[in-house]
Amino acid sequence: MPDADLSILNRVYEIILDRKQNYDERSYVCKLLNHRKGMNKILEKVGEESIETILAVRNENHEEIVSESSDLIFHLLVMLAANNVTLDEIAAELSARHESMKRD
């Protein structure tokens, strides 16, 4: 099975960072980042998409799993960007965990 091109995650994250710096009233990301509820709105979306992903898995619906997981990952990227957490930091943490698992 070929490896997926995960560079899309970097591209989406970069767009989110751009929206964070350059407000556009038409942008969904800008609306999330500047919502009156603040971080709570983003957390609501992460929670909502988590539940929808869980339900898709429970229903064993492959298409829904892909769709809802994509929504969840997108909202996680928004949450990370809002908290100044980079994908490099996440990758480094995953790499460190992977290395420690190889030693076990």
Swiss-Prot record:
Where would you find this protein in the cell? Cytoplasm
Keywords, A to Z, come to:
Amino-acid biosynthesis, ATP-binding, Cytoplasm, Histidine biosynthesis, Hydrolase, Nucleotide-binding
Catalysed reaction, written as an equation: 1-(5-phospho-beta-D-ribosyl)-ATP + H2O = 1-(5-phospho-beta-D-ribosyl)-5'-AMP + diphosphate + H(+)
Which Gene Ontology cellular component terms are annotated? cytoplasm
Pathway connected to this protein: Amino-acid biosynthesis; L-histidine biosynthesis; L-histidine from 5-phospho-alpha-D-ribose 1-diphosphate: step 2/9
What does the record give under GO molecular function? ATP binding; phosphoribosyl-ATP diphosphatase activity
Where would you find the membrane-spanning parts of this chain?
Answer: none
User: Do you know which SUPFAM superfamilies this protein is assigned to?
Assistant: all-alpha NTP pyrophosphatases
- Its Enzyme Commission number(s) read 3.6.1.31
GO annotation, biological process: L-histidine biosynthetic process
Q: Cite the CDD domains for this sequence.
A: NTP-PPase_HisIE_like
Which superkingdom is the protein from? Archaea
Question: InterPro entries from the xrefs?
Answer: HisE, PRib-ATP_PPHydrolase-like
Q: According to its UniProt record, which protein family does this protein belong to?
A: Belongs to the PRA-PH family.
Quote the HAMAP family the UniProt record gives.
HisE
This chain belongs to the protein called: Phosphoribosyl-ATP pyrophosphatase
Q: Which organism is it from?
A: Methanosarcina barkeri (strain Fusaro / DSM 804)
This chain is encoded by the gene named hisE
